Amino acid sequence: MASPPRGVLMSLFVLPLLALLINCCHKNLATSIRTSIIKLPGSDGSRSDAADTYCESWRLAVETNNAGAWDVLPSSCVDSVARYFNGDQYGSDYYVIVDYALAFAKTVKISGDGKDVWIFDIDETLLTNIGYYRAHGYGVSRSEPFDSKSFNEWVVQGTAPAFAASLRMYNALKKLGFTIILLTGRDEDQRSFTEANLRDVGYSGWERLILRGPDDQGKSATNYKLEQRSKLIDQGFKIHGNTGDQWSDLLGFAVADRSFKVPNPMHYIP
């Protein structure tokens, strides 16, 4: 009987070896792919083990408006938000924003006609109501919904402190020659308490304090504020800057050349 050709013998030896190598490589590649997949915090149901990480991510989402309109502060994040406000990070975040705002303000050429405007919101922008919110669950939560009656009672007291960073920014803008206009969602019948509170903590020299009148009741904050900004522009004012803690302070028509949102993860006002 004749011996098999040498090529056949080589095939019988090489093919099984090649199959073995392919199988090993496939397993190694699969293992490599599996180990390179990154699991996001909470994606495997372990969010409770990474609550702080989740809450910091949630806070970033709401501050950047990626969350859009949101309802309430997640109950799992109340402690995290409390630590944020009571620790150093909140103040640090605020001062960084103020530094950027003032850097921009210094690039503006002031005309000297009194029409170069910077707009400020009041609550959680110039004045902090953290004393009230600290006593009421740090904002709106399902366990303790917002109570407008008790908040208005707080406003009437006129004891809200100033943000040190905002006061610094406010006074620096005045020195640069900006006309300051205050645009708030507070009602007209709160004017005297609001003016007294602002002056008591160091604010002065604003051109106008605009509050909600009877015709503004029921309007969303966004619509109310864009209407007021439009009126200012119609009167010849140039809105260079705008600072507020809510996106509704800043968005819509007649926006500023630059808007600066200061942090507030306690509540959302549409």
Task: Locate each region found by the language model.
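Non-catalytic pre-domain segments flanking phosphatase-related domains
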Residues: 2-120
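Active-site neighborhood of HAD-like aspartate-dependent phosphohydrolases
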Residues: 69, 74-77, 91, 111-117, ...
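Extracytoplasmic/secreted proteins, especially bacterial periplasmic and envelope-associated proteins
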Residues: 93-96, 100, 153, 161, ...
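Loop/turn elements at helix/coil->beta-strand transitions in domains of secreted/extracellular proteins
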Residues: 113-116, 174-181, 204-208, 236-240, ...
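Substrate-recognition element of Asp-dependent hydrolases with the DxDx(T/V) motif
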Residues: 124-125, 157, 166-199, 208-212
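Solvent-exposed loop/turn segments at secondary-structure junctions
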Residues: 125-127, 133-134, 175-180, 185-190, ...
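Substrate-recognition "cap/lid" segment bordering the active-site pocket of phosphatases
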Residues: 188-240
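Acidic, Mg2+-coordinating phosphoryl-transfer loop and its flanking beta/alpha structural elements
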Residues: 226-229, 233-270
